[in-house]
Amino acid sequence: MKPAFLLALLLASPVTAATLPSPNWPAPADRGEALLQKSVLNAHNQARDRFGVPELNWSGQLAAEAMLHARYMAQTGIYGHDQTPGRRKKAGENLWRGQRGLFSYDVMVGVMVDEARHFRPGVFPNVSRTGDWSQVAHYTQIVWPTTTEVGCALASSATTDYFVCRYAPSGNKDGYQLAERRD
């Protein structure tokens, strides 16, 4: 076909056909602060229960701090841990990103919890079956025995969701024996 004919055919096509989403496209994930808090606590505490450590409590302060960093990433497009001096001593941090609106909070946390498949008991950072502690770092922060609080937040750019969880006291400390404490 000639390019001019293709252009004419494209211009003659109904605009609505190009703008309507496919019926096979997934519906946007449910969102909201109450759902975020409920989903996050449920997913974290299920993982902690399986590991044999006490439940986490929600921290509004940690959630507010997480929101600041999530917004920063959404505004700048720079994905990475908060580099604010002293933040690491104050709170642990887990990050996730994905296509805007497609993933539920359960999926966001579930990706982190799924790292359990690579976990092996040991002295941190030697706690990964693969030899790479970063492949279990989200999971180990979630189940870290001395962590008592979590707060998470979500911010979005035009295309990307940025999800941040903060933990206190922070986990993933070198030299700490980390083993499941199932009864």
Q: What positions do the PLM features span?
A:
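Histidine-centered active-site/metal-ligand motif
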Residues: 44, 69, 81, 86, ...
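Short clusters of hydrophobic/aromatic residues that line enzyme substrate/ligand-binding pockets
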Residues: 56, 79-81, 95, 142
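Short, glycine-/polar-rich solvent-exposed loops and beta-turns at beta-strand/coil boundaries
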Residues: 59, 85-88
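A well-ordered secondary-structure block
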Residues: 88-183
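Boundary at the C-terminal end of the N-terminal hydrophobic targeting segment
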Residues: 15-19
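Sec-dependent N-terminal signal peptides
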Residues: 4-12
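A short alpha-helix/helix-coil micro-patch that ends at or immediately precedes a cysteine
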Residues: 21-78
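Metzincin-family zinc-dependent endopeptidase catalytic domain
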Residues: 77, 81-83, 110-112
